[in-house]
Regions:
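A six-helix transmembrane bundle that forms the core substrate pathway of small-molecule transporters
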Residues: 1-205
Length: 205
């Protein structure tokens, strides 16, 4: 489906962007877009509306899935990361297996539109929770904000971070960050094989 296509394309951009702008802003903005575009799916009167909105939802919903791994790396040290990463890694396998089963019963009982209304409620709750309770976890972004605050409070330009000293234009930095996932995909065999396995898994389910 187009949702799965969007789900596969989105991470190529969102993961690198989180290293420039931070995790929190991407969580909040992409989840908001996803929540908004669930509504047209629920009230769609033609297949075109449904396809376009599902594609946008797939792209937007891929961001949290992509960023959680980085967020866990921000929060736990290498030796403490095993259990959180294992719990997170199981979600992509459990979700596609359980989701169609539950969704099938709900669709028969309430109608297919109610699947989107239920998804809207759950997604809106997650957006509110993340937007208003989750803090920034990416260290360079946190340090940049602290340095900016210290410059303002102390009226001194001596407080800068390594990220701020990077004088490369934003376009050049974006190009490097956005190309990196594709380089890993085609150069690193383990990344390529896992990606092929996951694509077959999602295609079958």
């Amino acid at each position: 489906t187009l949702f799965v296509v969007g789900f596969g394309v989105g991470p190529m951009a969102f993961a690198p962007l989180s290293e420039i702008f931070g995790r929190r802003i991407l969580y909040a903005s992409t989840l908001l877009i996803a929540v908004v575009f669930i509504v047209p799916c629920a009230v769609a009167q033609n297949i075109g509306t449904l396809l376009v909105c599902r594609l946008i939802d797939g792209i937007a919903f891929s961001a949290p899935m992509t960023l959680v791994g980085g967020t866990l790396a921000d929060l736990w040290r290498n030796e403490e990361r095993g259990v959180p990463m294992a719990a997170f890694s199981s979600a992509p396998f459990i979700g596609p297996a359980v989701g169609p089963l539950v969704g099938g019963f709900l669709s028969d009982a309430l109608g297919w539109r109610w699947l989107y209304w239920i998804q809207l409620c759950l997604s809106a709750f997650c957006w509110l929770l993340i937007t208003f309770t989750v803090r920034e976890t990416y260290a360079p972004t946190i340090l940049a904000r602290r340095a900016k605050q210290m410059r303002k409070e102390l009226s001194s330009d001596r407080y800068v971070t390594e990220m701020e000293l990077d004088e490369r234009p934003l376009g050049q930095r974006l190009r490097i960050f956005l190309l990196r996932p594709f380089q890993l995909l085609f150069i690193e065999p383990i990344v390529l094989f896992i990606s092929l396995y996951m694509s077959v898994l999602y295609g079958l389910l």
